Curated annotation (Swiss-Prot):
NCBIfam families: PRK00024.1, radc. Keywords: Hydrolase, Metal-binding, Metalloprotease, Protease, Zinc. GO terms for biological process: proteolysis. Belongs to the UPF0758 family. It comes from Protochlamydia amoebophila (strain UWE25). This is UPF0758 protein pc1765. InterPro entries: MPN, RadC_JAB, RuvA_2-like, UPF0758, UPF0758_CS, UPF0758_N. Residues 107-229 form the MPN domain.
Length: 231
């Protein structure tokens, strides 16, 4: 059987990521080696480890790689559509596992707790994403989800969508969050108006709006901390 010179099988056995994982465990492998196992083989012009190294060089690390779009992945030499799909699926599976662990009895008592929950998903996004965090009567996280994607001035966030989800999840209270792709978290007039509309809806339905966070680059603004949740 002919072995593809750019597959993992072409490497000396002791250097193959798969065998190293078996002998030493997954924690002993570098990100490049983990990616090589996921990809399985390289291209006609590059080994699988070279393709994996190109991915890490292009995106700089796991966080940026997880946020990469299919189009961005396809720009890396050696990554075709099938491999891009493999990567997106594998990385999303890891993200879901991490998110599930976080959701297990996560208490939100301060704006920083809400920020830590969603910052990795929002602070590097080039689209404006509006999310809602739902809490139980004791302030523990029930779940959080995306309500809309796009500029708040272009994609209207209607209170009906926010509170429909709150009721569906049997939330006792909620926190809303969105990012500013510019990196500047200071609230705009549109942000202030939207918050007032949501506050009115929360009072009518008896589901308190605890906070509105705006996520910027390595920073955030909390409406509650800044006394912007006007009564």
């Amino acid at each position: 059987m002919r072995i593809n010179e750019h597959s993992i099988q072409s490497l000396p056995k002791e250097e193959r990521p798969r065998e190293r994982l078996i002998r030493h465990g997954a924690d002993s492998l570098s990100l490049i080696e983990i990616l090589a196992i996921i990809l399985g083989s390289g291209s006609k012009v590059a080994s699988v480890l070279e393709v994996s190294r190109a991915l890490v060089t292009r995106f700089g690390g796991l966080e940026a790689l997880m946020q990469a779009t299919l189009t961005e992945l396809l720009e890396v030499q050696g990554i075709g559509f099938a491999k891009a799909i493999q990567l997106k699926a594998a990385l999303n599976l890891g993200f879901r596992a991490t998110r599930q662990q976080i959701k297990s009895r996560y208490l939100i008592e301060h704006s920083s707790h809400a920020y830590q929950l969603v910052k990795d998903e929002l602070e590097n996004e080039n689209r404006e994403i509006f999310m809602a965090i739902f809490q139980d009567t004791k302030g523990y996280l029930i779940t959080y989800e995306v309500i809309s994607i796009g500029s708040l001035s272009q994609t209207l966030v209607h209170p009906r969508e926010v509170f429909y989800s709150a009721i569906r999840h049997k939330a006792a209270s909620l926190i809303v969050v969105h990012n500013h792709p510019s990196g500047d978290p200071m609230p705009s007039n549109q942000d202030l108006k939207l918050t007032q509309i949501l506050l009115e809806g929360s009072r009518l339905l008896g589901i308190p709006l605890r906070d509105h966070l705006i996520i910027g680059k390595n920073s955030y603004v909390s409406f509650k901390d800044q006394n912007l949740l006007l009564k």
